[in-house]
UniProtKB/Swiss-Prot annotation:
GO cellular component: cell division site; cell tip; cytosol; Golgi apparatus; nucleus
SUPFAM superfamilies named in the record: WD40 repeat-like
Compositionally biased residues, Polar residues: 21-31, 76-107
Positions of region (Disordered): 1-115
Protein name from the UniProt record: Uncharacterized WD repeat-containing protein C18H10.05
Record-linked InterPro entries: G-protein_beta_WD-40_rep, WD40/YVTN_repeat-like_dom_sf, WD40_repeat_dom_sf, WD40_rpt, WDR44/Dgr2
Keywords, ordered alphabetically: Cytoplasm, Nucleus, Repeat, WD repeat
Pfam families xrefs: WD40
Length: 586
């Protein structure tokens, strides 16, 4: 291409027609997750010439014209058309192309972003050797104490499981972009859960198929998978991968999207679906063990944490029902004021917490579903009208202490995370505005209450650190925590649908498959250690494995390498850190 600049003294209004980005589709499905670039030729929005201010456009300037050889397209991949006065340029796309969701809400910057450098795109293009190198994910820290262990330079991609078909690459506007077709979003994951034993991971979503992935059991099995090569190891497999590359079970039976998953303490699995049924599964059986039919779409389901012969379900007909699995019938049911969106049990199973539309949370006794209490998320009725509770998780303030007060982590669609005391209904913690939390991604507490994990509107995983005794002190003093130490990182360009901090049992199972069982020390410390510099501790930490799923149906497994950079935050800037640098130079 040759660019010619012509000298002129007349005031021509040279404008480059901007590309419009329109979002096609509704909130459900793939409409919000595939952007379409179109050019309006009839009414192009004129924008100022690049490099010229509003004042400078009144003065004479040299208009920019582009001369192009015949049958040659410009660098932008667009066909070039000229107006009659040859003063303005119209870029018309050769075809309408669909792309993955952008990182920023400002989708007009899609053409200028280097999307082809995202993690999953590098894997699809084979730029990461899974056997020779670890791909460490950049982690951004905020408000981190100096002595706090961070994930920076420690978090790496262990495994990617999901659809076998890779996205197609295409050069648009001078950028190489990995292209996802709408048909490739048929396997979007809506729910994911790790079993209580830590051996299984279940994912389900749009295609109505429940996939169960098993932790690799023995070192011999791991070596066999590495020798077989990438053809049998799925999308991305490394020597430190956690799960089998292929699901050990694919449960087929639902006729519509699966909305919720719940594991029992004995590795039984319940799934609720838009086909108005709840089905019971087990990893060793390909067929559903039982089907529980409802009158409306079942939005949520939860196993009893102590006695897995019972479970509760919530549906769009504003009802919650307590079921007996052995009797295959409803023991108790009650009709609520609003539509039920999510439900969870107390750790002891004595009560349940129900999340509803219009920002309402309520507590009921499990035994007979008697009403106990309720509270609203907002004080303003107009704000509650738009608020919907999307996720609940109940936990004890002091882990494994039956006498401790309970707190419930509430996820809503107003981009905030809240933690309430279930007795006083007092707000203990509220996290919002900083990272624009995506309310569709269920926020979760780690099993030792050391972390809260969620996803943001910019497709980042957000991890909040909860210092020791902060929740206890805040609950006693009735104070509200608004800020916590935060770490954020990005693993994909598609919208996240769920994030999980794997329990310590999953890390133990993975360690046993990497090494001999005799190397695993007894008495694992499952709570956050008070001292981070303890060299005799077993190889299990408060956070070892993070799992994220996205709209493309992929499950990304990340591990933390605590052996690399075994120092606390701020080590490089400390006096001892400078001393070590000088010592290494000599």
């Amino acid at each position: 291409m040759r660019v010619l600049v012509a000298e002129t003294g007349r005031e021509d209004n040279v404008s480059v027609h901007s590309r419009e980005v329109s979002v096609n589709g509704s909130d459900s499905g793939t409409g919000n997750d595939a952007y379409k670039l179109e050019t309006d030729d009839e009414h192009p929005p004129a924008t100022p010439v690049r490099g010229l201010s509003t004042r400078s456009q009144k003065r004479p300037f040299r208009p920019l014209t582009i001369q192009q050889d015949e049958d040659v397209e410009n660098d932008t991949g667009m066909n070039t058309e000229y107006n009659d006065d040859n003063s303005s340029l119209v870029n018309t796309p050769r075809d309408s192309t669909t792309y993955a969701e952008t990182n920023s809400p400002n989708t007009e910057k899609l053409a200028g972003r280097d999307d082809d450098r995202s993690l999953l795109n590098l894997i699809d293009r084979g730029e990461i050797d899974s056997k020779r190198q670890r791909h460490y994910v950049p982690v951004h820290c905020k408000r981190m104490p100096k002595k706090e262990i961070t994930l920076n330079q420690k978090l790496y991609v262990s495994q990617v499981i999901g659809p076998a078909d890779a996205p197609k690459s295409k050069t648009i506007f001078g950028k190489r972009i990995m292209q996802w077709e709408p048909s490739q979003f048929k396997e979007s994951v809506w729910a994911s859960e790790i079993s209580k034993s830590g051996k299984y991971l279940a994912t389900a979503g749009k295609d109505a198929i429940i996939r169960v992935w098993k932790v690799i059991e023995t070192p011999e099995r791991r070596e066999t998978l590495l020798k077989e090569g990438p053809q049998s190891c799925g999308r991305f497999f490394t020597p430190s991968s956690i799960f089998e590359p292929e699901p050990v079970l694919e449960c087929v039976g639902h006729n519509a999207e699966v909305l919720s998953i719940s594991w029992s303490k004995n590795d039984f699995l319940l799934t609720s679906s838009a086909d108005r049924t709840v089905r019971l599964w087990h990893p060793k059986s390909t067929k559903s063990l039982a089907v529980f039919r409802h009158n409306e779409i079942v939005t949520c389901v939860a196993f009893h944490p102590i006695d897995d012969r019972y479970f509760v379900s919530g549906s769009l007909d504003c009802k919650i029902q307590l079921w007996s699995i052995l009797r295959h019938k409803i023991l108790h049911w009650t009709e609520l004021e609003y539509v039920v969106s999510t439900i969870c049990f107390y750790p002891d199973g004595e009560s349940i917490v129900v999340g509803m539309f219009y920002g309402l949370c309520a507590i009921y006794e499990t035994k007979n579903l008697q009403y106990v209490s309720s509270w609203l998320i907002h004080h303003s009725p107009s704000r509650n009208k738009k608020c919907r509770v999307t996720g609940l998780q109940c936990a004890s303030i002091i882990p494994n202490d039956s006498k401790s007060d309970n707190v419930v982590l509430v996820s809503t669609n107003d981009n905030a995370i809240r933690l309430y005391n279930t007795v006083t209904h007092a707000l203990v913690l509220k996290l919002s505005d900083a990272h624009r939390v995506n309310g569709r991604v269920l926020s979760r507490l780690s099993e030792d209450n050391s972390y809260i994990i969620s996803g943001s509107d910019t497709n980042e995983v957000v991890l909040w650190h909860i210092p020791n005794k902060v929740l206890i002190n805040a609950s006693r003093k009735r104070s509200v925590i608004l800020h916590l130490p935060t770490e954020t990182f990005k693993v994909c360009s598609e919208r996240l649908t769920s994030t999980i901090i794997a329990p310590a049992r999953t890390a133990v199972e993975a360690k046993e498959s990497e090494h001999d069982r005799s190397l695993i020390a007894e008495g694992y410390n499952l709570v956050k250690p008070h001292s981070h510099r303890s060299y005799g501790t077993p190889p299990v930490h408060p956070i070892d494995i993070i799992i994220a799923t996205n709209m493309a149906g992929m499950t990304i497994v990340l591990c933390v390498d605590y052996d690399l950079g075994n120092s606390h935050h701020g080590f490089r800037n400390s006096k001892f850190g400078h001393f070590v640098k000088r010592l290494l130079r000599t």
